[in-house]
């Protein structure tokens, strides 16, 4: 029974076989893609800067505020990049977004950013801890992205090509590892 449910879920989620002839191919609006990258850079810069200030702050209460503000800035940058990127995808159909799922995707991004800032504050972490944190962060980023995709209401079905789906997970985990290492190094070498 559970095997059958899992098989049905996989068949409904992943595209099996060749891409159908009636697949909708769309284009991106370049100016919105650029805007999404700019907002992501501003969010990352703000989150990293707040993490650096937090690492030098002696007051625990102020550290908590800086941690929360940094997570919101970083998370908002991540989420905005993805959401604006989705808006830039021009389709010849009406697309709406389910507010609760859209908000949930933002919460996932902010929590992932909170974890990154928490891990980056640790003075020492080995390979296993970095891998675990990167894995958690990558899964959270994918969760944010695919929750945002699930929030789309349109007159079409969405399927994912398995190789690209799993590549997105590997990329998200790698980006998470890079973010943790970069933030940690910047805290050690800037003032």
Feature roles, as predicted:
Residues 2-191:
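Polytopic alpha-helical membrane-helix bundles and their juxtamembrane interface segments
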């Amino acid at each position: 029974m559970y095997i059958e449910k899992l098989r049905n879920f996989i068949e409904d989620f992943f595209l099996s076989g060749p891409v159908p002839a009636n697949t909708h191919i769309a284009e991106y609006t370049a100016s919105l893609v650029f805007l999404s990258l700019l907002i992501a850079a501003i969010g990352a810069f703000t989150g990293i800067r707040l993490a650096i200030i937090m690492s030098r702050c002696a007051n625990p209460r102020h550290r908590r505020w800086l941690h929360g503000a940094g997570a919101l800035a970083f998370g908002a940058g991540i989420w905005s990049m993805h959401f604006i990127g989705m808006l830039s995808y021009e389709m010849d159909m009406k697309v709406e977004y389910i507010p609760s799922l859209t908000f949930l995707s933002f919460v996932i991004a902010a929590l992932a950013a909170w974890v990154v800032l928490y891990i980056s504050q640790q003075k020492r972490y080995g390979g296993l801890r970095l891998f675990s944190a990167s894995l958690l962060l990558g899964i959270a980023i994918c969760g944010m992205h695919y929750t945002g995709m699930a929030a789309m209401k349109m007159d079409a079905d969405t399927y994912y090509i398995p190789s690209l789906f799993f590549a997105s997970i590997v990329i998200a985990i790698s980006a998470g590892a890079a973010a943790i290492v970069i933030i940690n190094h910047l805290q050690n070498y800037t003032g």
